[in-house]
């Protein structure tokens, strides 16, 4: 069983969702974590994380080199 690891971090949930969609459009499954922290504190200290399977992290990093938010 693979663990989820952080591929990217953003200040706003919409930025994280766009990144997730970009990854998924390139065949890398991703989920967004910590959106609830934004509800209570805009630009929360934790940030909003985009998570991928550990086994997909290298591919996610390769794909994100071309990502322009």
Language model: regions and residue ranges:
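Acidic/polar low-complexity segments and flexible, solvent-exposed patches
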Residues: 1-69
């Amino acid at each position: 069983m693979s663990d989820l690891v952080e591929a990217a971090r953003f200040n706003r949930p919409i930025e994280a969702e766009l990144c997730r969609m970009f990854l998924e459009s390139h065949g890398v499954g991703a989920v967004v974590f910590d959106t609830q922290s934004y509800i209570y504190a805009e630009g929360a200290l934790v940030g909003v994380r985009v998570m991928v399977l550990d086994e997909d992290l290298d591919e996610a990093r390769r794909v994100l080199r071309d990502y322009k938010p």
